[in-house]
Regions:
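N-terminal, polar/charged subdomain of small-to-medium soluble alpha/beta proteins
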Residues: 1-79
Length: 79
């Protein structure tokens, strides 16, 4: 999953990309239909002077297919 996410974020030219799989913390939780729980950190000069919410929306937009396909259930984004 890390590579799938990283490849979709290449257009942001990230200087820093960190990925953490938190799925093991959510095993058996109600509403979890099998998609993973992840945390990511993305630092890019393209985000300079961009509000936090807009940065997060940009990142989520690039990963939308992974959400739609059920591969990501929850994602914590720091950008």
């Amino acid at each position: 999953m890390k590579q799938s996410i990283a490849s979709r974020l290449k257009t942001l030219e990230p200087r820093i990309f960190e990925f953490q799989d938190d799925s093991h913390l959510h095993v058996g939780h109600a509403g979890n239909r099998g998609g993973g729980h992840y945390s990511i950190l993305v630092v890019s000069t393209l985000f300079r002077d961009t509000p936090r919410l807009e940065r997060q929306r940009t990142v989520k937009g690039l990963l939308q297919d992974l959400f739609s396909d059920g591969l990501i259930h929850a994602l914590s984004i720091k950008a």
